């Protein structure tokens, strides 16, 4: 049937409906229209990518830790995989899809390769935009009760600085009483170091404003030993030395107890290789008393830790009334007046490791130049002070912290070609060892000789521990084989350890020097007894397991059902004294033999041969869980 022709009115009506429909679908700009349909993307331009999640473990659903990848595509943490894998399945079965597949390198290989990438330093432009603030750090704090608090975090920040970690270090320490010009001298040294590091000379930079520097330990609530956090590399190329500045603070304060001052001297000895004792006007008795004690403590510390006691010492007399007089002559006059009272200081100053330097007071007019103006005398003082600072900084690389010759016979690590020089990391470890001794509770000391006795006893105690641990390790190695272990009953092993412990206590106890010798021996005996008990617990369990295995095998191979009686009798007769611990072994031997019986009797030779073969393989591979573990 032919379609009727559309009139003009019908055509306009249909066209209006289509336009309204398109407007409803979002092609018009009306505010009430719906959101337009998304357009079809042809993929010709860049597509926004959804953020990819980090790979997670298929078991714990957390970020992978030490990952293991399988051929099936699943990844697991090594701990999750070891916990949920099927025992005895080789190659392993995937805990998720249960497919048997091999391990592949996968994520583990990628992580290992990323660790091998070289750590590139930041470009100079970025380093300048984000500099690390250099400041004085408090290393040793004196609390309100007069005790010492060692801040290992601050020590590690300084000595393990990237410029000092693997580099020999020189520590310039300024000693002296309060108001003796320590901060003044430290600021001049600090201002001269950058120029010497860059090759422009070691004289202080700037004018009056730059001489103020920073405030070293100015806060009375934070007394102790301070160090400048940033090292300066001085010396020739290939032989650079990281130089630090150290302020000993209140180490000479008479308010502190004698024990605290001795400990501060010990820490100062470890934290210095070039000492400057700054005094005002003349050397006083307090200065000489402190210096005598400091030299004595340095000798004790050097003997115990194998370090050079005093590498270089300057006696700097500021505001001296004899600025034109030679320093050694000035010291000679002092010791003529105080002869015999300070033997160690006198011996030190007569050698080549120490010198005396004199500086005039600022503004003091020379006696033979009465017409000189104050500005001229200040210029003279600056000139002499600048010459001294330049001389000290130029000589600093020659006095890096070092050990005594012959100390390296113990087989320690080599540092930068010269085995005697200490790097920053090695010095930080030595300070940590020293803090461990200082932190122990025990009898106090009031003299360097008593401190030397405590360090001597500490060395003897550590030697006794090492000797006993070595003996236990030898017994562990000697009884790893099954038949070797069965020859030594647990009671016999216990007696061997007890005899060795008593011999060590008797031999090392005679050499102890401190008054609290009995308390030291009791503490040492308790530690040795704990080591022996830990070994005996593991040894007894291993012995019982070996005995049960051998008893069951022999009983089954020889007499079938009656072999169980033989196995039980063998275990019971061998360990009558260890009945409680070995009853399980005897029962296993009897039950196993009774059930298996004669069915395996014909395979006795093969069984024993397999046991010995497995034992040899285990010896070659080594025990996965040794009885004695070292941290």
Swiss-Prot record:
**Metal-binding as UniProt keyword:** yes
Q: Which InterPro entries match?
A: G_GB1_RHD3_dom (IPR030386), Guanylate-bd_N (IPR015894), P-loop_NTPase (IPR027417), Znf_C3HC4_RING-type (IPR018957), Znf_RING (IPR001841), Znf_RING/FYVE/PHD (IPR013083)
Query: Residues in domain GB1/RHD3-type G?
Result: 166-397
Q: Where is the signal peptide?
A: none
Q: Which GO terms describe its molecular function?
A: GTP binding; GTPase activity; ubiquitin protein ligase activity; zinc ion binding
Q: Per the annotation, which location comes first and is thus the protein's main one? A: membrane
Q: Zinc fingers (RING-type): which spans?
A: 57-98
Q: Which domain of life is it from?
A: Eukaryota
Q: Which UniProt keywords apply?
A: Cell projection, Cytoplasm, Cytoplasmic vesicle, Endosome, GTP-binding, Membrane, Metal-binding, Neurogenesis, Nucleotide-binding, Nucleus, Synapse, Transferase, Transmembrane, Transmembrane helix, Ubl conjugation, Ubl conjugation pathway, Zinc, Zinc-finger
What pathway, per the record? Protein modification; protein ubiquitination
Quote the subcellular location field of this record: Membrane; Cytoplasm; Nucleus; Nucleus, Nuclear body
Kindly list the residue ranges recorded as spanning the membrane: 547-567, 580-600
Tissue spec. comment: Predominantly expressed in brain. Decreased expression in glioma brain tumors as compared to normal brains (at protein level).
Pfam hit, one: zf-C3HC4
Concerning PTM, the database record says:
Auto-ubiquitinated.
| Stored PROSITE patterns | G_GB1_RHD3, ZF_RING_2
**Which GO terms are recorded in the biological process aspect for this UniProt protein?**
embryonic brain development; endoplasmic reticulum organization; G1 to G0 transition involved in cell differentiation; neuron differentiation; positive regulation of glial cell differentiation; positive regulation of neuron differentiation; protein autoubiquitination; protein homooligomerization
Q: Interaction with ZBTB16: where is this region?
A: 131-631
| Assembly | Self-associates. Interacts with SP1 in an oxidative stress-regulated manner. Interacts with SIGMAR1 in an oxidative stress-regulated manner. Interacts with ZBTB16 (via C2H2-type zinc finger domains 1 and 2).
Q: What is the stated purpose of this protein?
A: E3 ubiquitin-protein ligase that plays an important role in neuronal differentiation, including neurogenesis and gliogenesis, during brain development. During embryonic development initiates neuronal differentiation by inducing cell cycle arrest at the G0/G1 phase through up-regulation of cell-cycle regulatory proteins. Plays a role not only in the fetal period during the development of the nervous system, but also in the adult brain, where it is involved in the maintenance of neural functions and protection of the nervous tissue cells from oxidative stress-induced damage.
Of which family is this protein a member? Belongs to the TRAFAC class dynamin-like GTPase superfamily. GB1/RHD3 GTPase family. GB1 subfamily.
Protein name listed in UniProt: RING finger protein 112
Q: Which organism is it from?
A: Homo sapiens (Human)
